[in-house]
């Protein structure tokens, strides 16, 4: 069976480099998008959600906030502004970020960027959901 070559990059580090995959699922703007070898070439806008890839029955999953993917017939490159692997433990710093985002949203301070606070809150909630799904 043909395989895709899968790479996943975030600003912090390359998360996956040139890994073989049978299937990749992306949280696309229009909904979840599945990619198999031979897929039509495309650029996909990614939304908050989970990127999954399967190889030989083994599946890995990552939480992302946003990004884009370049899909080709034989490979796929995912670029995410922030991502975390499901096996990574939630740090105390992530918990503090969640609390700060909640406080910023509930604040009546005119200097608060509400859109940014909402994104930060969604980011932290998504990461917590990732941890709960794997427990």
UniProtKB/Swiss-Prot annotation:
Gene3D superfamilies for the chain: F0F1 ATP synthase delta/epsilon subunit, N-terminal
Name of the molecule in the record: ATP synthase epsilon chain
Keyword Membrane: yes
GO cellular component, one term: plasma membrane
Subcellular location: Cell membrane
Sequence segments annotated as region (Disordered): 84-107
Organism field: Elusimicrobium minutum (strain Pei191)
Protein family: Belongs to the ATPase epsilon chain family.
Keywords per UniProt: ATP synthesis, Cell membrane, CF(1), Hydrogen ion transport, Ion transport, Membrane, Transport
Subunit structure and binding partners: F-type ATPases have 2 components, CF(1) - the catalytic core - and CF(0) - the membrane proton channel. CF(1) has five subunits: alpha(3), beta(3), gamma(1), delta(1), epsilon(1). CF(0) has three main subunits: a, b and c.
Annotated InterPro entries: ATP_synth_F1_dsu/esu, ATP_synth_F1_dsu/esu_N, ATPsynth_dsu/esu_N
Top-rank taxon: Bacteria
Pfam families: ATP-synt_DE_N
Role this protein plays: Produces ATP from ADP in the presence of a proton gradient across the membrane.
Residue spans of biased composition, Basic and acidic residues class: 86-102
Keyword Membrane (UniProt): yes
Lineage, highest ranks first: Bacteria, Pseudomonadati, Elusimicrobiota, Elusimicrobia, Elusimicrobiales
GO molecular function annotation: ATP binding; proton-transporting ATP synthase activity, rotational mechanism
Membrane topology value: Peripheral membrane protein
């Amino acid at each position: 069976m043909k395989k895709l070559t899968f790479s996943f990059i975030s600003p912090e580090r390359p998360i996956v480099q040139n890994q073989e995959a049978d299937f990749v699922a992306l949280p696309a703007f229009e909904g979840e998008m599945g990619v198999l070898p031979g897929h039509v070439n495309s650029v996909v806008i990614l939304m908050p959600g989970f990127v999954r890839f399967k190889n030989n029955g083994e599946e890995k999953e990552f939480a992302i906030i946003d990004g884009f993917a370049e899909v080709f017939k034989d490979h796929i490159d995912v670029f995410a502004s922030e991502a975390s692997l499901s096996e990574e433990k939630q740090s105390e710093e992530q918990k503090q970020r969640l609390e700060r985002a909640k406080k910023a949203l509930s604040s009546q301070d005119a200097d608060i960027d509400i859109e940014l606070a909402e994104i930060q809150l969604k980011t932290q909630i998504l990461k917590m959901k990732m941890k709960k799904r794997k427990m």
